[in-house]
Amino acid sequence: MADYWRKQQPGQPLYGDILWSRPERRDQAGRLTIIGGNSHGFSAVASAYQLARQLGVGEVRAVIPDALGAKLPTAVRHQLDDLILAPSNPSGGLALGAERDLAVAADWSNNLLFIGDNGANAETAKLLERFLTNQAHQGARVTLARDTIDLLVYSAEALLARENCHLVLSLAQLQKLARAVYYPRVITFSQGVKQIAETLHKFTISYQIVITLFHDDNLLVAGEGEV
């Protein structure tokens, strides 16, 4: 096995010291803001919120379009301890006017999860690009998932150059990003986990992001050339 590739054994933590040092008190377990949803979809935000609470995140906040807020059942609202309704556009997604809410969220938690369900919305794509490339927010740690990646393909160069950025994506989305930046290595679905691991090794040397990718029944996490 290549020296950059560390493989976890079944039933054993790969980094035991991190696992055992998790905070036991909720007030010491950090803050997380979950961002996403549109007037026709909320499941990704709701699922991520519930999972974050189950895993012991100290404080969790959700930012969703105000067009969606009116459609939330009362029972769902009561499950969300901290809910921000940000400006939405006519299509029901987050509007450019939501940038202030994202900035406040970044100041509050410094950990932002863009969970998706954005819809194929050009204005939301512009909002995300503007926020993620704004130098004032470069210190915020961001995780991008699901259709958030698709919205930002045309901003791939700036996205991959961002510090503190974690992409949770599919192999198809990795292909799109690689093509968008003219990455010289071919990525195909027929490649085995060893070839994909080598690609992630080289890709995360070229770009300072962290990538999480599920392929061929293996979950791979890569950053700074380590897989």
Regions found by a protein language model. Give the residues of each.
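Short, contiguous strand/loop micro-motifs
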Residues: 10, 34-36, 186-187
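Short secondary-structure boundary/capping elements
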Residues: 15-16, 40-44, 93-98
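Glycine-rich phosphate/dinucleotide-binding loop and adjoining beta-alpha-beta core of small-molecule
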Residues: 5-6, 65-227
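Positively charged, low-complexity intrinsically disordered leader regions
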Residues: 1-27
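Well-ordered alpha-helical segments embedded in enzymatic catalytic cores
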Residues: 19, 44-47, 101, 127
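Generic signal for short, ordered secondary-structure residues
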Residues: 11, 30-31, 152-154
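Generic, low-specificity signal for short hydrophobic/alpha-helical stretches with a mild N-terminal bias
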Residues: 14-17, 34, 113, 159
